[in-house]
Amino acid sequence: MAKIAIMGFGTVGSGVLEVCRRNAASIARRAGEPVEVKYILDVRDFSGSPDAALFTKSIDTILNDPEIKVVVETIGGTKFAYPYVRRCLESGRSVCTSNKEMVATYGAELLALAKEHSAAFLFEASVGGGTPIITPMHQCLAANHISSIRGIVNGTTNFMLTKMKRENMGFDAALKIAQQLGYAETKDPGDDVDGRDACRKVAILASLACGHHVYPDNIPTRGIRDITVADIKAAEKLDSAIKLIAWYNEGGDGQMAAGVEPMLVSNSNQLAGVDDVFNAVLMKGDMLGDVVFYGKGAGKLPTASAVVADVIDALKEGVKVHDSLFWKPAEKPEGLLEDRNTYPWYLRVTGVAAALLPSVAGAGHVVFEDNGEAAYLVDAATSADIAAVTEKIEVLGGKVALAMKKLED
């Protein structure tokens, strides 16, 4: 029998215990032996729980027990999770986690540490929740060079944008509903609505795609706070939908770029039809072409099931999994990764008449003009071009309230 420990007994951690018990027979069959949770590490008081005997407040209880082969980390954040995971790996125990912040920040270091101590460090649930993405990337797509990733990887903002579109609802109202349903944090929803959650996820995917660590701090990141009902309606007029897109590109010259930002997505693009809390990631491989991963990106049991699947892999494969699941450490570059590609751009401008926009922004057409605001679709421009346009509009006494790339097929 394989004995495991869970660190952190919140939503996902409690889900791991539930999955291990509800599907014990099938897990044992796939792992080659029964899997039992022996310890749960949590500083809170669970003395009234039916599982009170499993709880400990000290990681040393886990590390001093030679029966524990795999540790599940669902604490979240990095303050406690990172040093605890390091200690587990250094002791030769495999670690399975759903912690995207830790993987995005310390992934290369922890992967190397796992290899050094003949352990596994697995994190399928960190990007897609219950939707498999990491394992298909390093196994099924191993013969491909991944040059492009486009994804909707945050279910909360996708739910909000869907609400705004279907019900002509503003950002604040959509956020309130997302909070009431438990999709967004009540105290600070910034990780979701400001794009930080999506940034961490695309940093992990980019690291796996290019083979070296991509730091979240180097990825330009914007959220959806500036999106208005007028923008949603303008998108419909342009046969498009507004989505928060996390993306990665590798050019023919090997130059890499990545970002998280709201985009106009043409209705002919598969991502435009991904609504509510669903996520989708579109990847381009040099041999396979396009492949799409689609499913719910969060939820207690879907995410926990992905963590338990990693536990099975850790028990069966151990350090061998890192023959393909690995990326190298890299020096952290200065500044942000720069996107030099050309796109159509949607601009919503205040304080400047629509008639002036062609001469200021270049070739394109007016989408709407109303109550001192105008929207203009630029035919083709780079990010640097749009920065220059923004300066020109400010000289004229106006302001670019929103600038979005248009993602075609």
Where are these regions (language model features)?
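A conserved regulatory-domain signal marking ACT and ACT-like small-molecule sensing domains
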Residues: 311-409
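Rossmann-like NAD(P)H-binding beta-loop-alpha module
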Residues: 68, 115-197
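Conserved active-site and cofactor/substrate-binding residues in soluble primary-metabolism enzymes
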Residues: 7, 11, 15, 35, ...
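Catalytic, metal-anchored helix/loop core of enzyme active sites in primary metabolism
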Residues: 148-150, 158-161, 165, 183-190, ...
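Substrate-binding/catalytic subdomain of NAD(P)-dependent oxidoreductase enzymes
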Residues: 173-273, 278-280
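Rossmann-fold NAD(P)-binding glycine/threonine-rich loop
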Residues: 81-87, 91, 98-138
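N-terminal glycine-/serine-/threonine-rich beta1-alpha1-beta2 phosphate-ribose binding loop
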Residues: 1-91
